Amino acid sequence: MRIKINLQCSHCGSKNYLTSKNKKNHPEKIQVPKYCPKERKVTLHIES
């Protein structure tokens, strides 16, 4: 079963991206480098 998750910037705390994941295959939190428009650079985004 896929669930919707928000990706939150680790620097400024803004929620910039909405994605989905299969909780059965990936029970751990997702960490992805993405562009943060508030910081104007690529930062680590963590599942919130």
Swiss-Prot record:
GO BP of this protein: translation
MF terms in GO: structural constituent of ribosome
InterPro entries noted in UniProt: Ribosomal_bL33 (IPR001705), Ribosomal_bL33_CS (IPR018264), Ribosomal_bL33_sf (IPR038584), Ribosomal_zn-bd (IPR011332)
One GO term describing the cellular component: ribonucleoprotein complex
Keywords: Ribonucleoprotein, Ribosomal protein
Keyword Ribonucleoprotein belongs to the record: yes
Keyword Phosphoprotein applies: no
Family: Belongs to the bacterial ribosomal protein bL33 family.
Protein name: Large ribosomal subunit protein bL33
